[in-house]
């Protein structure tokens, strides 16, 4: 049997043992808890002195400082260039994390390796020392186990009750001398031969400190058991939790404590309350402190240090691949820590709704409690809804959270007035102020599906909140009073109203205030860029007057865009120096992210697809644009006799065509206005992707007109210079609708012939929407659906007719795309684009 097979068998046996032990613990614990009267547990909790609770929590938080001695020993042994204060802070964070999700200490060992490898040259020695620390966590327990074996601590009752623990106790006791001998004979560093012994002493003191915390919990709930028996039960319970490999020993530790004190005649309700207090004081409080420390300890400075560290090694395998993300992970720790703290705060104060409702049951002024309960619940829900926004460092989310904290403080002061909780709220508020100053964006984009999800989530949370309160009152036999007083009857709707007012007011203020922040370069800069680098088929639309411009720092590339519904809709590809497009888009996306806007590109070519892809976008084919090769275009030949017939017909009717250069007279503009108004027939003009009938816009390029024999304008088209590839296009094409003449054909034919005469080589006839979209079985579902619209809804919009019309000019078809973020909805993005096009 080779080593690989042995390792696999060992892993399977280990997993099987842990799973079987976990199932056994859960079943046994459930059986023990099923007989507990939770009402008595709550009554016992209400008797606890609040100052004793404060001292307990302080003691629980302070007890974890002892574990920091591991890291002090480690830093001194390896001569790390790191201050004692930083060691203590980082160590506290690591140990608090390890206590919750330790998996036998392996999580803590991994985090230590990640943090301290930047402070030492000898990585191999670091790993050896960390392994020694990991093992020494058991040696301290081994030393205490020896004291039970030699009857210093009396555990006879529990050993008789749980016989299998005796063998674990003996095995662990034998581990200590073996470890001491091995660590002294083969130390990780010959100059530090007694490190193993030092770590064992630290481990022993730490386990005793944890036992003292549990003992203090017992004293608070009035459990009368000798200190020696307390320690004995704790040691055996800790061994059970360690062997189970369950994070924090949850379940196994608690079961042994429950059974141990039950053998001593302690009521189960008191033991349960003692365990809950212990878990909160020794696990939850240190985690809270660690999260607060993380908000200050990690962040920009840590990220910069690691990025500049000569010890930072590129990823080469799975482990190093994960480690390569450490600078990003560490940079996010402060916001993640604060988000977790806000989440816990929300949950804690949701539970405190019970206190408000309970007080309201015995108070005649129910109206006041309606309002206070609704405010309190609204604030808790707002905290919960903005957890993700806080993690994403959104200032708007942080403001929502700060307002929520203030509302909770007000509700707390007017109801149960817990100064411990108010102190906690003040701490969270201070952390939110720090986070607000560090925030990297004003707000996150508002998306319809997110709003719907938040609404459904809010209803669900409020429903669960009501069920929780009602269920608790049923358990306490006071629900009958609640039904008579109707404290819970209407506050759901009041809560929704308060949330709507707060959310609506802040959202409106942000949109109003920061709409002024949107920057726009002047049109002269854009003209200079086009003059130097050329434009594209859409660049002439800079003169339409309905767009803003974003220019890069070097002023050699720009985008034209328009704001609509928390989105920046960009028209076409970037314009200018192609080498600057990457920098331009990065600056634009940073700008949009800061303001909390989505970015949508409309009608882009396939030339820059890789560039858009780099920014996390996906694509939807809008259709194809007809580009006519003027070098091949002609009205001669059999296939073109229709073109000649059209031109001949206009000649017979004495209808002429000419190009008028700006500036234009008022009389000429009035003639065009008359034709345009009749053509529009009270329909609204489109915007953004096309020009509008506007004298300023029209005066920027020549206009082609067709006149009748009376020299009256009957049709016109505005030219669109492209400033690249010897190409030209037309924008507005309008004619008198009452004339039964092929005026559109006439304008196009005359423009094609004129453009060819002027030396242009390409003519853009515009896009055929949804043309050639989703034609293959392998296409995306959304594109296949769009293709069916093209085929079967021609009555609503002339999709096929437009393609057929342009096809007779034998164009080359070039695809055009919608570009939008991969986490955005296609239909929502299309809707925003259409709103931009159809509204001024």
From Swiss-Prot:
Residues 1-8, 74-89, 150-161, 222-229, 293-337, 391-394, 437-450, 511-840 are cytoplasmic. InterPro entries: Acyl_CoA_acyltransferase, L-PG_synthase/AglD, LPG_synthase_C, PG_lysyltransferase. It catalyses: L-lysyl-tRNA(Lys) + a 1,2-diacyl-sn-glycero-3-phospho-(1'-sn-glycerol) = a 1,2-diacyl-sn-glycero-3-phospho-1'-(3'-O-L-lysyl)-sn-glycerol + tRNA(Lys). Residues 30-52, 111-128, 183-200, 251-271, 359-369, 472-489 are extracellular. Pfam families: LPG_synthase_C, LPG_synthase_TM. It is found in: Cell membrane. It is a multi-pass membrane protein. Keywords: Antibiotic resistance, Cell membrane, Lipid metabolism, Membrane, Transferase, Transmembrane, Transmembrane helix, Virulence. The chain crosses the membrane at residues 9-29, 53-73, 90-110, 129-149, 162-182, 201-221, 230-250, 272-292, 338-358, 370-390, 395-415, 416-436, 451-471, 490-510. GO terms for molecular function: phosphatidylglycerol lysyltransferase activity. The keyword Transferase applies. Disulfide bonds: none annotated. Its EC number is 2.3.2.3. GO terms for biological process: lipid metabolic process; phospholipid homeostasis; response to antibiotic. The keyword Transmembrane applies. This is Phosphatidylglycerol lysyltransferase. The gene is mprF.
């Amino acid at each position: 049997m080779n080593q690989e097979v042995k390792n696999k068998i060992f892993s399977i046996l280990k997993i099987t043992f842990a799973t079987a032990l976990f199932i056994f613990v859960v079943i046994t614990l459930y059986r023990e808890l099923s007989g507990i009267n939770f009402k008595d547990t709550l009554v016992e909790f209400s008797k606890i002195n609040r100052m004793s609770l404060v001292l307990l929590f302080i003691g629980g938080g302070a007890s974890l400082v002892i574990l920091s001695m591991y890291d002090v020993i480690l830093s001194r042994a390896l001569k790390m260039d790191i201050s004692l204060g930083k060691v203590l802070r980082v160590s506290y964070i690591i140990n608090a994390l390890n206590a919750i999700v330790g998996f036998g200490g392996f999580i803590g060992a991994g985090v230590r390796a990640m943090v301290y490898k930047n402070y030492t040259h000898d990585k191999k020695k670091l790993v050896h020392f960390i392994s020694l620390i990991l093992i020494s966590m058991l040696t301290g327990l081994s030393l205490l186990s020896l004291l039970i074996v030699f009857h210093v601590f009396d555990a006879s009752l529990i050993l008789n009750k749980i016989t299998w623990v005796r063998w674990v106790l003996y095995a662990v006791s034998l581990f200590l001398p073996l470890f001491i001998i091995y660590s002294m004979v083969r130390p990780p560093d010959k100059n530090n031969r007694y490190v193993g012994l030092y770590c064992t002493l630290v481990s022993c003191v730490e386990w005793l400190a944890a036992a003292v915390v549990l003992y203090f919990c017992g004293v608070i709930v009035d459990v009368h058991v000798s200190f020696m028996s307390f320690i004995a039960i704790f040691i055996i319970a800790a061994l059970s939790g360690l062997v189970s490999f369950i994070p924090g020993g949850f379940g196994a530790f608690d079961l042994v404590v429950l059974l141990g004190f039950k053998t001593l005649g302690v009521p189960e309700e008191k033991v349960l309350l003692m365990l809950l207090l212990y878990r909160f004081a020794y696990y939850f409080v240190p985690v809270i402190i660690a999260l607060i420390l993380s908000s200050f300890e990690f962040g920009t400075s840590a990220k910069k240090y690691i990025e500049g560290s000569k010890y930072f090694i590129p990823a080469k395998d799975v482990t190093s691949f994960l480690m390569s993300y450490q600078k990003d992970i560490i940079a996010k720790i402060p916001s993640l820590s604060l988000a977790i703290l806000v989440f816990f705060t929300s949950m804690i104060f949701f539970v405190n709704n019970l206190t408000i409702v309970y007080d309201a049951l015995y108070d005649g002024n129910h109206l006041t409690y309606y309002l206070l309960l609704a405010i309190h619940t609204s604030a808790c829900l707002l905290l919960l809804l903005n957890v993700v926004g806080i993690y994403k460092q959104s200032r708007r989310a942080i403001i929502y959270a700060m307002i929520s904290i203030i509302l909770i403080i007000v509700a707390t002061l007017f109801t149960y007035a817990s100064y411990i909780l108010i102190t906690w709220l003040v701490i969270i508020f201070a952390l939110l102020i720090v986070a607000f100053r560090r925030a990297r964006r004003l707000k996150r984009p508002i998306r319809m599906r997110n709003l719907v999800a938040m609404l459904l989530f809010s209803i669900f949370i409020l429903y669960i909140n009501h069920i929780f309160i009602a269920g608790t009152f049923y358990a306490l036999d006071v629900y009958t009073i609640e039904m008579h007083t109707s404290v819970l009857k209407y506050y759901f709707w009041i809560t929704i109203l308060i949330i709507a007012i707060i959310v609506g007011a802040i959202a409106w203020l942000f949109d109003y205030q920061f709409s002024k922040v949107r920057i726009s370069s002047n049109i002269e800069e854009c003209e200079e860029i086009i003059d130097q680098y050329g434009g594209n088929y859409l660049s002439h639309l800079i003169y339409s007057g309905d767009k803003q411009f974003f220019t890069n720092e070097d002023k050699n590339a720009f985008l034209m865009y328009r704001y609509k519904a928390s989105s920046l809709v960009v028209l076409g590809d970037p314009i200018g120096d192609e080498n600057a497009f990457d920098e331009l888009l990065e600056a634009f996306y940073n700008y949009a992210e800061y303001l909390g806007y989505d970015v949508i590109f409309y009608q882009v070519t396939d030339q820059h697809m890789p560039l858009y892809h780099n920014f996390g976008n996906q694509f939807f084919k809008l259709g194809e644009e007809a580009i006519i090769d003027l070098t091949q275009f002609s009205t001669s030949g059999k296939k073109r006799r229709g073109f000649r017939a059209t031109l001949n017909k206009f000649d017979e009717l004495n209808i002429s065509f000419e190009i008028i250069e700006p500036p234009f007279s008022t009389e000429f503009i009035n003639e065009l206005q008359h034709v345009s108004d009749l053509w529009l027939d009270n329909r609204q003009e489109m915007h953004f992707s096309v020009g509008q009938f506007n004298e300023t816009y029209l005066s920027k390029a020549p206009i082609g007109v067709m006149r009748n024999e009376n020299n009256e304008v009957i049709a016109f088209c505005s030219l669109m210079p492209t400033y690249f590839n010897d190409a030209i296009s037309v924008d507005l094409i309008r004619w008198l609708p009452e004339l039964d003449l092929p005026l559109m054909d006439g304008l196009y034919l005359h423009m094609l012939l004129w453009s060819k005469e002027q030396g242009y080589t390409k003519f853009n006839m515009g896009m055929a929407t949804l043309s050639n979209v989703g034609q293959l079985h392998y296409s995306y579902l959304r594109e296949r659906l769009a293709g069916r619209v093209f085929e079967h809804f021609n009555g609503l919009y002339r999709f096929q007719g437009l393609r057929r019309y342009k096809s007779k000019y034998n164009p080359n078809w070039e695809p055009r795309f919608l570009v939008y973020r991969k986490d955005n909805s296609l239909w929502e993005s299309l809707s925003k684009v259409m709103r931009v096009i159809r509204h001024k």
